[in-house]
Structures are given as structure tokens and as C-alpha cells.
């Protein structure tokens, strides 16, 4: 990813994913920053991989997750 290679963003904080709760069908992903208003506890990080060799309008980024669970209304990884 060009911004990471140019040193404009840090690899450690390159995205944040907000799932929006257990009973909704959408969320949001923010690249290049973390929105601290969307969480109260420690963040989890997961490796990302590109589906294609280049990132363009037809590309997508895949985040592979083995499992996600909601326990007492809280997301458990």
C-alpha cells in the first residue's frame, strides 16, 4: 500500500474496523487512522492480505478471521 511504503501511515495503526453491534448487518472500516470514539476497551489487531497484486478500483482487501463471538453483548475474539 503506497501510503505505508512512503511512511505516511504506520503499519501498526493502518485501519480500524467498527462492527456496529451484534444485531446489525453493517459496520465501517477506517483506513489510516483509529476512531477512539468507537471503542472503550483494548483494540484487537488482525493481519490483512490483498486479494490482488495491485490496489485499484477493482481490488479488495481481505481480513481473515477464524471466529468472532458476542458474549453478554461484548465482542470476544
Curated annotation (Swiss-Prot):
Domain Peptidase A1 as annotated: residue spans: 1-77
SUPFAM superfamilies the UniProt entry points to: Acid proteases
InterPro entries xref list: PEPTIDASE_A1, Peptidase_aspartic_dom_sf
Protein name in UniProt: Uncharacterized protein YGL258W-A
Organism: Saccharomyces cerevisiae (strain ATCC 204508 / S288c) (Baker's yeast)
Amino acid at each position: 500500500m503506497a501510503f505505508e511504503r512512503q511512511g505516511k501511515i504506520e503499519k501498526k495503526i493502518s485501519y480500524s474496523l467498527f462492527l456496529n453491534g451484534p444485531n446489525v448487518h453493517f459496520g465501517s472500516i477506517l483506513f489510516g487512522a483509529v476512531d477512539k470514539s468507537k471503542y472503550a476497551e483494548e483494540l484487537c489487531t488482525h493481519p490483512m492480505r490483498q486479494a490482488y497484486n495491485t490496489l485499484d478500483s477493482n481490488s479488495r482487501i481481505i481480513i481473515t478471521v477464524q471466529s468472532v463471538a458476542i458474549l453478554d453483548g461484548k465482542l470476544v475474539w
